[in-house]
Design a protein with these regions (language model features):
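DNA major-groove recognition helix of helix-turn-helix
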Residues: 35, 45, 61-64, 113, ...
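Alpha-helical residues within the helix-turn-helix
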Residues: 11, 22, 51, 89, ...
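Short alpha-helical DNA-recognition segment
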Residues: 15-33, 92-110
Length: 145
């Protein structure tokens, strides 16, 4: 769904791939790869895209059909990690359970929860399958405008 929404939002904004490429500092081919699913968009590029066009991450990932207007995302790995940990605890899951379900090492998942690394798009896609309801915007502590 993310790939489809990237293309849909670009087209709604009446922008060409080369214009998105210029904004994100990448090649046209890379933008095309993101939109077709050939390449996975890195989280930082996705955040830049969402911030540039005031897009909800929940909307981009297909968790909602409504694009709410949010404050820009400010990357705070520790806060994201704390929110991940809280989400897991509320749902009575272990790190091992979550890591196994999304097919990553427990240590890698632990690093996300401890704020050592920015969570990846691939990991977020996995979390969407585990948690319902789930909000990526909430995970990133985004505030509605």
């Amino acid at each position: 769904m993310l790939e489809k929404r990237l293309k849909e939002t670009r087209e709604k904004l009446e922008l060409k791939e080369k214009e998105i490429a210029l904004i994100l500092g990448i090649s046209n081919k890379t933008v095309s790869g993101y939109e077709t699913g050939y390449d996975t968009i890195p989280m930082k590029n996705l955040i830049n895209y969402a911030n540039a066009f005031n897009l909800s991450l929940d909307y981009l990932f297909g968790l909602t059909d409504e694009n709410k207007s949010y404050q820009p995302i400010i990357i705070d790995k520790r806060a994201i990690g704390q929110n991940l940990k809280e989400l897991r605890r509320i749902n009575n899951k272990t790190q091992e359970y979550v890591a196994n379900k999304i097919n990553i090492a427990v240590g890698a998942y632990s690093n996300y929860e401890n704020g050592k690394y920015l969570i990846s798009v691939r990991t977020l896609k996995g979390l969407i399958r585990i948690y319902n309801p789930f909000s990526i915007d909430k995970l990133f502590d985004r505030k509605v405008k």
